[in-house]
A protein has these predicted regions:
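PLP-dependent class I/II
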Residues: 1-165
Length: 165
């Protein structure tokens, strides 16, 4: 689907490619049963335009997000040593190892949110193996990333002082 890649979620467009004819028929039936098989009036044109004319924009976006990622990694390494950024290849969602904070990821996310207004997702909500990790979205303007990092630093300082009490 072009929706996340090109930031056109409001168009509610996606494509399904199913090579196996038996499975394709089952998918087709399910989509039609749920009445989600018909695109809105703009969806097809928007999707085609995104895929055929959005290459340069997407390259610039990837570069910008990569710079955001570098900014986050350097900031956390220098300013918030209690956290570690999990290495990743390609995503605008970063996983932060918060096992050094002395509380669960859920508790950390909640306390940081209460103290600073910064919303991070606790890894537990994504299944087994997510315990001890926070998820951070960096697909936003750099100023917002920097503001989020300042809030994160403040939240971690507060959380660490709470744990020491």
């Amino acid at each position: 689907a072009p929706t996340k890649t090109f930031n056109i979620a409001g168009m509610q467009t996606a494509a399904v490619a199913v090579p196996n004819p038996v499975i394709r028929h089952k998918v087709w039936r399910a989509l039609n049963t749920d009445e989600v098989a018909e695109p809105n009036a703009f969806a097809v044109d928007v999707a085609v335009a995104a895929f055929t004319k959005g290459g340069n924009w997407l390259d610039e976006l990837r570069s910008y997000i990569k710079e955001n990622k570098t900014t986050v990694i350097e900031y956390i390494k220098e300013q918030i040593p209690q956290l570690k950024v999990v290495p990743s290849d390609a995503t605008y969602l970063l996983w932060l190892d918060c096992r050094g904070l002395g509380s669960s990821a859920s508790q950390a996310a909640e306390r940081i949110r209460e103290a600073t207004g910064l919303y991070l997702s606790a890894g537990e909500q994504y299944g087994k193996g997510g315990e001890g990790f926070l998820r951070m979205n960096i697909a936003c303007p750099r100023a917002r990333v920097l503001e989020g990092l300042e809030r994160l630093k403040k939240g971690v300082e507060i959380l660490c002082s709470d744990v020491q009490k």
